[in-house]
């Protein structure tokens, strides 16, 4: 019996061995030997840090190792792999520079107000061209902003309409704007038509679908967002320490089900109703009562007790969680309110991430670490909070306060990609006054701009160039222009004098001009218009420009003192004749006044210093319509320059000394200079004020009550102790 058991055990073991042989043998035989592989792979050594690679990058790592260069090149031609070098024709931009063409609007085609604002911003910019043959970039006349099929703004048959455009060319060199994509319940990023090789300027775009250095992430903005100008940030003054009533706030919808519900449903875990106030409501949508949970009634009641604006303006940090889509209106609201955004939207490509360093203006959180958010924001030092808060105001006013700024920033980014040799530096984008006012075509060296002297630790040039605008023929040696030439030339800081001859009479011979110790360059322009005084002449080799009218009366001491003051404020206009603006509530328009009051908002360029960069900005940034108005009226060029400089700096000009009269009163009445006594001249300046304010979208001029006088000015001390003693006698 025992023998039978032993034989049975041996038989069973043999059967098992045979089964194992047949199961493993074919598998081992199917595995080719190392020398038999017809397509051997490159050896792939395991990465000891592979466990720390984010899950969404592992496929990319394998692709880079396994795929051949030809395979990668073939894949890059797909729409989802587009880059500037593969899906953009640079040849179109070499002929006429960076110009943008907007397709003409078709009859019967509805366009939303937001998309019309986008198109109007492009058409009013310096990039616009009405000739498609000159264009480098094309923008559709079809509204692509809202691609939610449930939206009343949804445009049907868009695919067919786009394919019928004769310049479409599979989207090459085209830019498509989009705010909303996808619909309930998935809210995918599908636009409902094939974008081909077009670039996307899209809100709520994910890092997964974002094509780096090709697409542009823009902020989600409402239909009420202003087209131009926009409100300034709400930060009026800095408080030390920078803490406010609340540490962290949020007020918004709570999605009970579906995408975006996880984070908002969990906010109650960190809400303490004291310094962390995170409020949600279930009252939205048609079927919210069907899905309401046990917390809804309590959440709804608490939600109604708090005022959102009061919370927004009195909180140090503002939570910006994702909604149904990755982007949220709360983002721009927090920026404007100087409430540091705490981003809680994993996978969102932040707006203009290509140029903006968001670490300087926001706290980037992680939805998976929601419970750590309160301790994280509490640990941020107050110096850091103050810096973050100030940067929110800069970014809001520079890039986000209007539709126009969002659109122009988008176009500037694309221009930087096209004209890489003259692209903005990261510093230009992230420091005052921002990339829209710092044109790299002027210079690639930051030291040539008046905004970066302190940052670079340098000073402006120690000399200035005087530019005298002459419109009256030389008749007598007693004319004010001769006295002015002599007085300015005696300044120890004067490098040269330029005379812009805008007179109808022929240019005087050289012997008619007085002898001076500095070079006098006389330039006769081809088009003798008012804007020519602000052209960026190559002859101007100094940073400072002293702009003068031909009938200005200044002494050498006054010139020296004004230049000394300008050296401390090189980004502002510094000079003598002050004017002001006011709001006329009866006429509901802006007014211009030359009355001597206790404040001012303009310093006229008839006797003022400014940086030569503003000549370049005046010529290349301002639209032809404004400069055309100035040339047509032969008036208002000084007001326009003040508008421009104040829009850039957000600060007023600086008046020096108490001098009020700066014009020669004995000019002949037949002279063009006598236009100042013409009543129509003053009325024209009122019109200019409102035309300029309309284009800027706001009133950029800032009032000031500051006047700078020399040390010991009018003090009862010995005249020998005063450096600018002659000023007191004038």
UniProtKB/Swiss-Prot annotation:
GO terms for cellular component: endoplasmic reticulum membrane; Golgi apparatus. It is found in: Endoplasmic reticulum membrane. GO terms for biological process: heparan sulfate proteoglycan biosynthetic process; protein glycosylation. It catalyses: 3-O-{[(1->4)-beta-D-GlcA-(1->4)-alpha-D-GlcNAc](n)-(1->4)-beta-D-GlcA-(1->3)-beta-D-Gal-(1->3)-beta-D-Gal-(1->4)-beta-D-Xyl}-L-seryl-[protein] + UDP-N-acetyl-alpha-D-glucosamine = 3-O-{alpha-D-GlcNAc-[(1->4)-beta-D-GlcA-(1->4)-alpha-D-GlcNAc](n)-(1->4)-beta-D-GlcA-(1->3)-beta-D-Gal-(1->3)-beta-D-Gal-(1->4)-beta-D-Xyl}-L-seryl-[protein] + UDP + H(+); 3-O-{alpha-D-GlcNAc-[(1->4)-beta-D-GlcA-(1->4)-alpha-D-GlcNAc](n)-(1->4)-beta-D-GlcA-(1->3)-beta-D-Gal-(1->3)-beta-D-Gal-(1->4)-beta-D-Xyl}-L-seryl-[protein] + UDP-alpha-D-glucuronate = 3-O-{[(1->4)-beta-D-GlcA-(1->4)-alpha-D-GlcNAc](n+1)-(1->4)-beta-D-GlcA-(1->3)-beta-D-Gal-(1->3)-beta-D-Gal-(1->4)-beta-D-Xyl}-L-seryl-[protein] + UDP + H(+). Pathway: Protein modification; protein glycosylation. Residues 28-730 are lumenal. Pfam families: Exostosin_GT47, Glyco_transf_64. Belongs to the glycosyltransferase 47 family. It is a single-pass type II membrane protein. It comes from the Eukaryota. Glycosyltransferase required for the biosynthesis of heparan-sulfate. Mn(2+) binds at residue 551. The chain crosses the membrane at residues 7-27. UDP-N-acetyl-alpha-D-glucosamine binds at residues 533, 549-551, 637-638, 685. Residues 1-6 are cytoplasmic. Its cofactor is Mn(2+). Disulfide bonds join 636-688. This is Exostosin-1a. Keywords: Disulfide bond, Endoplasmic reticulum, Glycoprotein, Glycosyltransferase, Manganese, Membrane, Metal-binding, Signal-anchor, Transferase, Transmembrane, Transmembrane helix. GO terms for molecular function: acetylglucosaminyltransferase activity; glucuronosyl-N-acetylglucosaminyl-proteoglycan 4-alpha-N-acetylglucosaminyltransferase activity; glucuronosyltransferase activity; metal ion binding; N-acetylglucosaminyl-proteoglycan 4-beta-glucuronosyltransferase activity. Its EC number is 2.4.1.224, 2.4.1.225. The active site is at 638. It comes from Danio rerio.
